[in-house]
From Swiss-Prot:
Function: Phosphatidylinositol-4-phosphate-binding protein that may antagonize the action of GOLPH3 which is required for the process of vesicle budding at the Golgi and anterograde transport to the plasma membrane.
Residues at which a 1,2-diacyl-sn-glycero-3-phospho-(1D-myo-inositol 4-phosphate) binds: 67, 76, 157, 160
Subcellular location: Golgi apparatus, Golgi stack membrane; Golgi apparatus, trans-Golgi network membrane
Keyword flag Phosphoprotein: yes
Residues covered by region (Beta-hairpin required for oligomerization): 176-187
Modified residues (Phosphoserine): 112
Entry GO terms, CC: cytosol; Golgi apparatus; Golgi cisterna; Golgi cisterna membrane; Golgi membrane; trans-Golgi network; trans-Golgi network membrane
Name recorded for this polypeptide: Golgi phosphoprotein 3-like
Membrane-protein topology: Peripheral membrane protein
Location (main, coarse): Golgi
């Protein structure tokens, strides 16, 4: 009986320890310098997906460019990075047969809810999937780009609209109906331009005034956002307000950053592997 009691206590301590780690990871995300704003936006916390969509939206029109066919997969990549940064998923450790980022499978670390519907829906898919899948495969599955009819169940639907509704609830966007000749479309114009400008300036500064020329020394969420903005084809929107000289510098530095070898960067001591795995997936696609 004593042994069983001790074993039960050890199990309880282990579970409590895991919950504490998850709580600390979520707390660290909330307290990240990247999530601390000034002025009116000090209480606003945005996910990477929300930031990418906000950067891609036309302020007054409230929709993304009709010619942008990259943002859907970019948002799915953002979901994977967000889950990894919150301690919910990770890449399996490298082995002799699986050294490359794109060969290694995405594993579940914790199925504890994040409070975000899209993140939690993805988490359920990852938990329920056997055998496990790679980062590139997950981006394809979540986007619905699969020829396997049995895997269409993993597609996340209405992602842009759901993210936009989150931004409406956070007071950054509003909802309107616009008529486009033959059909009506729901749009989400930006109402909190201060928050969007803060986001734009943060990215501009990261490749100009605060440029460190080393991704390992960059704030991880800023690095992730630069990678996702590039992969989602919205980086042009970020730098469009700069003078010609600064625009050229910013674009060249961002280009140098995303052209680094993900396999090399992902093995460095302080690297967040999921960021580089997502970049590698987009570079290959």
């Amino acid at each position: 009986m004593t042994t069983l009691t001790h074993r039960a206590r050890r199990t309880e301590i282990s579970k409590n320890s895991e919950k504490k780690m998850e709580s600390e990871e979520d707390s660290n995300w909330e307290k990240s310098p990247d999530n601390e704003d000034s002025g009116d936006s000090k209480d606003i916390r945005l996910t990477l997906m929300e930031e990418v969509l906000l950067l891609g939206l036309k302020d007054k029109e409230g929709y993304t460019s009709f010619w942008n066919d990259c943002i859907s997969s970019g948002l799915r990549g953002g979901i994977l990075i967000e889950l990894a940064m919150r301690g919910r998923i990770y890449l399996e450790p490298p082995t002799m047969r699986k050294k490359r980022l794109l060969d290694r499978k995405v594993l579940l670390k914790s199925d504890s809810p994040t409070g975000d519907v899209l993140l939690d829906e993805t988490l359920k898919h990852i938990k329920a999937t056997e055998p496990t899948e790679t980062v590139q495969t997950w981006i394809e599955l979540l986007t619905g780009e699969t020829w396997n009819p049995f895997k269409l169940q993993y597609q996340l639907r209405n992602v842009r609209e759901r993210i936009a509704k989150n931004l409406v609830e956070k007071g950054i966007l509003t909802t309107e109906k616009q008529n486009f000749l033959l059909f009506d479309m729901t749009t989400h114009p930006v109402t909190n331009t201060t928050e969007k400008q803060r986001l734009v300036k943060k990215l501009q500064d990261s490749v100009l005034e605060r440029w460190v020329n080393d991704p390992q020394r960059m704030d991880k969420r800023t690095l992730a956002l630069l990678v996702l903005a590039h992969s989602s084809d919205v980086l042009e929107n970020v730098f469009s307000s700069l003078t010609d000289d600064k625009y050229d510098v910013a674009m060249n530095r961002a280009k140098d950053l995303v052209e680094l070898d993900p396999e090399v960067e992902g093995t460095k001591p302080s690297a967040t592997e999921m960021i580089w795995a997502v970049l590698a997936a987009f570079n290959k696609s």
